[in-house]
Amino acid sequence: MLFAGTLAAQTPVPEWQAGVDKVKSLIKTNPEQASDAAGELLKGKNKKNVELVTSVARAYLDAGQLKEAETYLEMARKADNKAPAVSVLEGDIAFARKDIGKACQLYEQAIYFDSNYKDAYLKYAQAYKSASPSQAIEKLNQLKAIAPDCLEADKELAEVYYATNRFGKAADTYAKFIDTPVATEDDILKYAFALFLNHDFEKSLAVA
């Protein structure tokens, strides 16, 4: 995975998912067969299905095959160049090429096309959380303004606060999601440590 903590899918599995899984499994073992399977999958009206085309592109991206991912990105662009998923995919490819500035421009573009597209906010924040924590926090607060219950935003915010030694804010933000499936063991440890460093020793021991 390029990014951890992306949104968990709550929607039913699409009928073409098995085909994408087949492509994924063949990319490393038999690239030619993977390409044939992708071609078969993207025949006819399927090549206009943005979700499907971006899923195939992402299979190649996750395998580190950026040129192939870009080939399917072009197909996705032809299907709908204003779909936020297409901008996010292009941003992820730029991020994989270590071009963080370009990646974040593309995540911003996705938000311009659809201001409710949560993944774009999260990926922008993930890209900038080391290079520019203040920009990451600003983007996550924008997401919280439109989706107050977004636990993934809380998780990212907590990580940025923790990494920048704002342990009081980190502890308060960890508390919002620590009892949910979004929290990992690492989050629980950091929550306990943030409480400890914020001199909330009793609570820190209870969490740990």
Indicate residue ranges for each PLM-predicted region.
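N-terminal leader/linker segments that initiate helical-solenoid repeat arrays
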Residues: 7-74, 78
